[in-house]
Regions:
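Hydrophobic alpha-helical membrane-insertion segments, chiefly the h-region
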Residues: 17-18, 82
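A domain-start/cap signature at the N-terminus of enzymes
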Residues: 20-73
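Bacterial N-terminal signal peptides
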Residues: 7-15
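Residue-level signal for beta-strand positions within conserved beta-sheet cores that form or flank
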Residues: 16, 55-57, 109
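Positively charged n-region of N-terminal signal peptides that target proteins for export
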Residues: 1-5
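Short, flexible loop/turn elements at secondary-structure junctions
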Residues: 50-52, 65, 83, 117-120
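Short beta-strand element of the alpha/beta-hydrolase
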Residues: 60, 71-83, 113
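Cap/lid segment of the alpha/beta-hydrolase catalytic domain
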Residues: 84-126
Length: 126
């Protein structure tokens, strides 16, 4: 009886996993290719004091095309994985190109994107 319950749970988990995978939309070809003639956001490097590790850290801040300091924007934080730093997304992805393309296509609300160095070691390489 115990084996039947385990088999049933595994079968159900497999079925739900297959169903979930089939509903994930695919990205359009060229979504991460720089397009000529579209407005581009700006990327700045900022330095901030980290109270957590007691040292200065860097972060990249992307502001959308047409950014105005007088307007309020939502903020998206893109965090790197273990061993990464604030450049991780730019080294292994193209967030600024993807965001610019989505803005140009009218598919995204303008937002500020922050890519911090979230390493928790005071004297690391970053």
């Amino acid at each position: 009886m115990k084996n039947i319950a385990i088999i049933l749970v595994c079968a159900l988990a497999y079925c739900f996993g297959v169903q979930a995978q089939s509903t994930i939309p695919h990205s359009q070809a060229g979504f991460d290719v720089e397009k000529a003639g579209i407005a581009q956001g700006k990327i700045e490097t900022v330095t901030y004091n980290s109270k957590t590790v007691g040292t200065k850290r860097k972060a990249l801040v992307y502001t959308p095309p047409g950014f105005s300091k007088s307007k309020k924007y939502p903020v998206l934080y893109l965090l790197h994985g273990i061993g990464g730093d604030e450049l991780e997304w730019f080294n292994n992805g193209k967030p600024q190109i993807i965001l610019d393309n989505l803005y140009a296509e009218g598919k995204l609300t303008p937002m500020i994107v922050v890519l911090p160095n979230g390493r928790a070691i005071k004297d690391d390489r970053a």
